[in-house]
Amino acid sequence: TSDAPLYLIVATRDYVDAAGSAAILDADCGGRTLRNVLVSIVENYRRGTPNGIVMDSDSALIFSPSHFTWMDTNFPAGTPREGYPVEIQALWFAALDFLGREEPEYRKLSRRVAASIEQYFFQLPGRCSDCLHARRGVPARAAVPDDHIRPNQLLAVTLGAVTDPARCRLILTNSEELLVPGGIRSLAD
């Protein structure tokens, strides 16, 4: 999965913020500190994992193989989204931003990710793309933007990857199509 390790980092950030202390980062996790585990996740995403998750060196966005997000599982078959899914980029941004509190290199990288989201995910008029479709090895700049409206783009706002008020309003307005009494659908009609 591309998202679960990043959710661990975001959940840790939320805990640190709620506790008002980063002491949990020194907790022992099988011989490594939690801090070391989180840094290891980021570094493996940067270098590339054995299962194909890798950072695009040009854009700093994360490539995700098919069937690696919550939405495109293979059993049963879901919505294939091989390439650069927007929620993975939002989680990646948040992970880097959190670790950037202690390591300036990660903060700088998070800013590159935010700039790439702005550059590549808003190519279609009136839309934030759900995914930039690409095969392994294809950079984000050559990926094909997806115009489907899905709730994944909301993470770009809630995790702080998109902060421009006009872009945030665009995402929220488009997501209104997904609202139903009591919740939000995963796909528009």
PLM segments and residue spans:
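Hydrophobic or amphipathic alpha-helical targeting/insertion segments
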Residues: 5-27, 38-42
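Replace the tail clause
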Residues: 24-75
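Catalytic cores of carbohydrate-active enzymes
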Residues: 39, 43-46, 52-56, 80-85, ...
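Inter-helical turn/loop segments and adjacent helix faces that build the functional surface
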Residues: 15-32, 96-108
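Amphipathic alpha-helix face/heptad-repeat signature
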Residues: 4-5, 34, 88
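Acidic/His metal-coordination segments adjacent to aromatic residues that form catalytic metal sites
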Residues: 1, 61-83, 134-142
